[in-house]
Amino acid sequence: MSKKLHIKTWGCQMNEYDSSKMADLLGEYQGYTLTEDASEADILLLNTCSIREKAQEKVFHQLGRWKTLKDKNPNLIIGVGGCVASQEGKAIKDRAQCVDIIFGPQTLHRLPDMIEQVRRGDKAVIDISFPEIEKFDRLPEPRAEGPTAFVSIMEGCSKYCSFCVVPYTRGEEVSRPLDDIILEIAQLAEQGVREVNLLGQNVNAYRGATHDGSICSFAELLRFVAAIDGIDRIRFTTSHPIEFTQDIIDVYEDTPELVSFLHLPVQSGSDRILTAMKRGHMAIEYKSIIRRLRKAREGIQISSDFIIGFPGETKEDFADTMKLIEEIGFDHSFSFIYSARPGTPAADLPDNVDMEEKKQRLAILQDRITQQAMRYSRHMMGTVQRILVEGPSVKNPMELRGRTENNRVVNFEGLPKHIGTFVDVEIVDVYTNSLRGKFIRGEDEMDLRRSLRPSDILAKHKQDDDLGVTQFKP
């Protein structure tokens, strides 16, 4: 009888990536298979997030539900990982005796050893340390699950924004070596992955060591990834404006594999609030980045993060945010009401914005961005869009679902053979969260894979001089 593993994941794409690695790790080394049913699992893992309000209470409510399962099955192992685990540590065990393992984002690779310790009789295993980036050396080879894949390129953040817990829960910025990243992506490409999403708390701070001891920048990494055979689209999440340098913008000008969509958090349009947040830039600097980006890549779509009701935010500050939203024309946003995170500098500031006022501001902001997104979507009506087909449609499994370069979901009628490939569709209808497409052509009609060897090019432009030396003139 196979051993079962159930993982519940909250939070960002980095957590989703970490959870997939936990499943791969325990599957390869200990033979566990994933199950959606917690009641039939031998191990329950909760991968937590501490960004939002009441994150800790959410964890303990879930553990309370799992405790009833452990009461019925004393051999059940329960583990808590992620940022809440890193932040709370032993306090989780003190409050929830049913927990056997507590591990941080940087120690998930030690899970097999921790499980063995519990099996041998240890009452609780806690490891929330920050080893350099050792975990990537201990994880099994990547396994593709469809045509898209997340690839972590770095961990942590060293910006210390006043509202953010990430530097305290995931540590400071540490970059993976270039060769490790390229190998992982090449392995995924061999398995049919066509699009990679490079992950990190601040990817444009990437500074990875190379085989010769030099340092690879994020812009250079993007070009290396674009050169990998089979990788046709590159996305990345997430960035910080103060390190969105000109060399990164230049990649948008000459690297078509990099999609015409960028998520660049700004948090506020008020210089006063940006200063209080310790973001390290002003609104005009953010606008300068976007202006240069749109010069390098016409039509690029921009999304962002916004925090509403940060301590001291006035009506004038919020008006500055709305002005920035209109000037930039954001296509999408992740926007939240501010909630103090314990241990951050902003937690000591007086939260003097009325909750009803916060809710009203959030509704106004979200409504404006929804309007802007719908306007962009309507402009796509009648156009032909190239989409990567990810699988069956969520609402209608008889149809297919794909995603445009600018990150819009398109549902259309197509054949199963198109899954994992690119197709061209005409946009025939627009909805709030998706588009409707009509199939135009498949990848076999696009000539995407044509490649010319250098000798072929030379043969077409062969010019011998008097000495018989071949010269090439493009």
From Swiss-Prot:
Its cofactor is [4Fe-4S] cluster. The keyword Magnesium does not apply. Keywords: 4Fe-4S, Cytoplasm, Iron, Iron-sulfur, Metal-binding, S-adenosyl-L-methionine, Transferase, tRNA processing. InterPro entries: Elp3/MiaA/NifB-like_rSAM, Methylthiotransferase, Methylthiotransferase_CS, Methylthiotransferase_N, Methylthiotransferase_N_sf, MiaB_methiolase, rSAM, rSAM_horseshoe. One of its GO terms (molecular function) is 4 iron, 4 sulfur cluster binding. [4Fe-4S] cluster 2 binds at C157, C161, C164. Its EC number is 2.8.4.3. Belongs to the methylthiotransferase family. MiaB subfamily. PANTHER family: CDK5 REGULATORY SUBUNIT-ASSOCIATED PROTEIN 1 (PTHR43020), MITOCHONDRIAL TRNA METHYLTHIOTRANSFERASE CDK5RAP1 (PTHR43020:SF2). This is tRNA-2-methylthio-N(6)-dimethylallyladenosine synthase. It comes from Shewanella putrefaciens (strain CN-32 / ATCC BAA-453).
